[in-house]
Amino acid sequence: MANAGLQLLGFILASLGWIGSIVSTALPQWKIYSYAGDNIVTAQAIYEGLWMSCVSQSTGQIQCKVFDSLLNLNSTLQATRALMVIGILLGLIAIFVSTIGMKCMRCLEDDEVQKMWMAVIGGIIFVISGLATLVATAWYGNRIVQEFYDPMTPVNARYEFGQALFTGWAAASLCLLGGALLSCSCPRKTTSYPTPRPYPKPTPSSGKDYV
């Protein structure tokens, strides 16, 4: 039987990772303007996310522009969007499935093996969700690095990693760790031995058998 405390810990970690994926997807700070070179503008901060680009003035005023055209976006941004949304949807499914398999829940109490398998399946879905988030954030981060060191990119058009990217990496790690802990609920196979057959006891011989 799996440890109920370890199972609950995995569920909490994976759920926190799922929430972190939602926060990372919604935040606009996936990449922030790099203050490198001679043309440094400290009066404003420029950052960009999956859905919009924003400019924050030193006065506290923030102006954001939503990406209107889907076809006008680069392939990296479109793929990152898709992977993050897929990861969030998979995480939602994993929460429902693993909740049924939790020992603290009363669902499927009559069949403990099936209940444990539900927790295992939920953990596997959490792992897949974490991998989708990890691939999305790593792909986007790699694009930022390539553009930063590209000599053809102007100095005033270079960006660095934003807070949302770090949030996505942390969320992916939590989903992977929590999903792995839930997957440890896999029921072990028990070796069954055949039931020994009772043999009749030999009857003691009596003197009547001899003449």
Curated annotation (Swiss-Prot):
Membrane topology reported for the UniProt record: Multi-pass membrane protein
Subcellular location: Cell junction, Tight junction; Cell membrane; Basolateral cell membrane
InterPro entries with a match to the protein in the record: Claudin (IPR006187), Claudin1 (IPR003548), Claudin_CS (IPR017974), PMP22/EMP/MP20/Claudin (IPR004031)
Pfam families reported for this sequence: PMP22_Claudin
Positions in the Cytoplasmic compartment: 1-7, 103-115, 185-211
Tissue specificity: Detected in epididymis (at protein level). Detected in testis and epididymis.
Functional note: Claudins function as major constituents of the tight junction complexes that regulate the permeability of epithelia. While some claudin family members play essential roles in the formation of impermeable barriers, others mediate the permeability to ions and small molecules. Often, several claudin family members are coexpressed and interact with each other, and this determines the overall permeability. CLDN1 is required to prevent the paracellular diffusion of small molecules through tight junctions in the epidermis and is required for the normal barrier function of the skin.
Quaternary structure (record): Can form homo- and heteropolymers with other CLDN. Homopolymers interact with CLDN3, but not CLDN2, homopolymers. Directly interacts with TJP1/ZO-1, TJP2/ZO-2 and TJP3/ZO-3. Interacts with MPDZ and PATJ. Interacts with OCLN, CD81, CLDN4, CLDN6 and CLDN9.
Protein's recorded name: Claudin-1
Originating organism: Rattus norvegicus (Rat)
Lineage of source species: Eukaryota, Metazoa, Chordata, Craniata, Vertebrata
Gene that encodes the chain: Cldn1
